[in-house]
Amino acid sequence: MGGHASCPQGSVNAGAKAAALLCECDALNESDRAILATVRDYVTDPFGGGSGIAHEDPRFGRLSAANGLMETKDGKLRLSMDTRYGTSMPSEELKAKLRTVWGSRGWSLPSLESREAFHVDDNSPVPEMIRAICTEMTGVDRPCFRMSGGTYSHYLPNGFSCGVSLSAKGATLGEAVGSDALSFPEGHGGVHQPDESLDIEGFFSAMQAIAHVVLQCDELLHN
């Protein structure tokens, strides 16, 4: 079952499962099995435990390291890894660890890009303002939270990330899946799944909330 790089808990990587199976295949030579053993060992745990890069950030929680693509090109196996990490680990430190752990198995990292994590200042009044607007519109008081997702707010001097994952009955889509609000069974309808869902009435309600957020942000930032 696939998952999202920002929250991979409960997901299963198909490539890692295939690599683990092929490691037991006597028809493959020792060199090929060693290559596949690295995939099995380093990719199975989406939180970096297998490759030794596991890290807990006080703001964002556990580092996640998700493999998205595997391919053979020019006779070599190539992988892509999407690693999400917080503000307490410098990017150069993580790069050094990645080069060391993969290099120890004979792998090279021809492309290694990173950027520092984005987060809203702990003293900013904006998250509480967004929470208050959502509480007023839905009648449900929820805390703000941090997640390891990519955001264009990273490029904006006064950018703040907020989403549209509300159902018409006021529950978040995560709360609503499998309930009376949305009739999807567990494991279906979630983000980036083949049957990803969006509650239309909830979407329009969220647009109204975001309009209020934009106006309130403008007032906070210019007064």
Locate the predicted segments by residue.
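A short beta-alpha structural unit
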Residues: T38-T44, A66-G68, D82-T87, S108-P127, ...
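Zn-dependent metallopeptidase/amidohydrolase metal-coordination segment
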Residues: K73, I133, V140-L220
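Midchain, well-structured core segments that form catalytic/ion-binding scaffolds
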Residues: M1-M89
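Conserved active-site and cofactor/substrate-binding residues in soluble primary-metabolism enzymes
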Residues: Q9-A20, R62, M89, E93, ...
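Redox- and metal-dependent alpha/beta enzyme cores, enriched for Fe-S-associated oxidoreductases
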Residues: S91-G106
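Generic secondary-structure signature for well-ordered alpha-helical cores
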Residues: C23-S31, G103, W107, T135, ...
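A short small-residue
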Residues: M1-H4, S108-E113, G187-P194
